Curated annotation (Swiss-Prot):
Belongs to the GcvH family. Keywords: Lipoyl. The glycine cleavage system catalyzes the degradation of glycine. The H protein shuttles the methylamine group of glycine from the P protein to the T protein. The modification N6-lipoyllysine is found at K64. This is Glycine cleavage system H protein. One of its GO terms (biological process) is glycine decarboxylation via glycine cleavage system. Gene3D superfamilies: 2.40.50.100. Transmembrane segments: none annotated. Binds 1 lipoyl cofactor covalently. The keyword Magnesium does not apply.
Length: 127
């Protein structure tokens, strides 16, 4: 399982890369994609959609199941990664480059885990 130092993480296995205080990219962690298995479909939010911290804003379908992806910030979707619509396997291949959406006008943030805290959280979850 790969965890990058320049990101923060959630207990629902999303990663967040802040570009500044009110703009962030959101994606699924390496652990999440490994657990889900080969992804075959992704449903992304629409540009202009409002997001709410802790609520589902996308979903992914693997050969095993359909899973919600939760937004760790409240804001507005300013851009989606359209490449994922045609190639959801990019989430499996390069999870930390395969961002789902850019969220701007962020007004609320989830309590995030540092890379070290996330690694510990996953270890406990795997026990």
């Amino acid at each position: 399982m790969k965890v990058l130092e320049n990101l923060v993480y959630t207990k629902t296995h999303e990663w967040v890369r802040f570009e500044d205080e009110t703009t962030a990219l959101v994606g699924l962690t390496d652990y999440a994609q490994q657990t889900l298995g080969q992804l075959v479909f992704v449903n992304l939010p629409q540009e202009g959609d409002e997001t709410v911290t802790g609520e589902s804003f996308a979903d992914v379908e693997s050969v095993k199941a359909v899973s919600d992806v939760y937004c760790p910030v409240t804001g507005v979707v300013s851009e989606i990664n359209e490449e994922l619509l045609d190639a959801p396997e990019k989430i499996n291949d390069t999870p930390y480059e395969a961002w789902f959406a850019k969220i701007t006008d962020i007004t609320e943030k989830e309590e995030f885990l540092s890379p070290e805290e996330y690694e510990e959280f996953v270890k406990k979850e795997m026990e």
